[in-house]
Amino acid sequence: MTVTPRPTADLVDEIGPDVRSCDLQLRQYGGRTDFAGPITTVRCFQDNALLKSVLSEPGDGGVLVIDGDGSVHTALVGDVIAELGRSNGWSGLIINGAVRDASTLRTLDIGIKALGTNPRKSTKTGEGIRDEAVEFGGVVFTPGDIAYSDDDGIVVIAAG
């Protein structure tokens, strides 16, 4: 399902005080700064095998929300995994964790927001949970809801 990005500030003005807006000050790393789409979730801690598997599937314009428990000890996404997501049609990644290969990520046509960078690789044991609600930044990210992201922040709208 393709969702057209909209300015998050406009969405906040339309929705009002009950808006689901992420409080975390995530930084832009991808080459696409405005992105939107249905949410798929992964919860993992310093291990990126599951999220790599998810990004290997057709994204259909979706947004993968990755809850890495706020760890910046290892990077969950680098250039290879980001390119995998881009080539499979994912609109963007929202990462409560770190990325690496930041200079290359900026050249890829995929949205990527994360807490920061660390060149250290994560483990690849496959531990983690997929397609369950995750919460960070004061927002519950529920699979199927719609995420909108731009330079101002992230807003989540209930599906339907």
From Swiss-Prot:
Superkingdom of origin organism: Bacteria
Q: Which cofactor does it need?
A: a divalent metal cation
Q: What reaction gets catalysed by this protein?
A: 4-hydroxy-4-methyl-2-oxoglutarate = 2 pyruvate; oxaloacetate + H(+) = pyruvate + CO2
Q: What does the Swiss-Prot or TrEMBL cofactor note state?
A: Divalent metal cation.
Signal peptide annotation:
none
Mind telling me which InterPro entries this protein's record contains?
Answer: RraA, RraA/RraA-like, RraA/RraA-like_sf
Q: Which UniProt keywords apply?
A: Lyase, Metal-binding
Q: Which GO terms describe its biological process?
A: regulation of RNA metabolic process
Q: Name one GO molecular function term.
A: oxaloacetate decarboxylase activity
Q: Where does a divalent metal cation bind?
A: 101
NCBIfam families per the UniProt record, alphabetical: NOT-MenG, PRK09372.1
Q: Describe the function of this protein.
A: Catalyzes the aldol cleavage of 4-hydroxy-4-methyl-2-oxoglutarate (HMG) into 2 molecules of pyruvate. Also contains a secondary oxaloacetate (OAA) decarboxylase activity due to the common pyruvate enolate transition state formed following C-C bond cleavage in the retro-aldol and decarboxylation reactions.
Family label = Belongs to the class II aldolase/RraA-like family.
Q: How is this protein organized at the quaternary level?
A: Homotrimer.
Q: What is this protein called?
A: Putative 4-hydroxy-4-methyl-2-oxoglutarate aldolase
The species this protein was found in: Mycolicibacterium vanbaalenii (strain DSM 7251 / JCM 13017 / BCRC 16820 / KCTC 9966 / NRRL B-24157 / PYR-1) (Mycobacterium vanbaalenii)
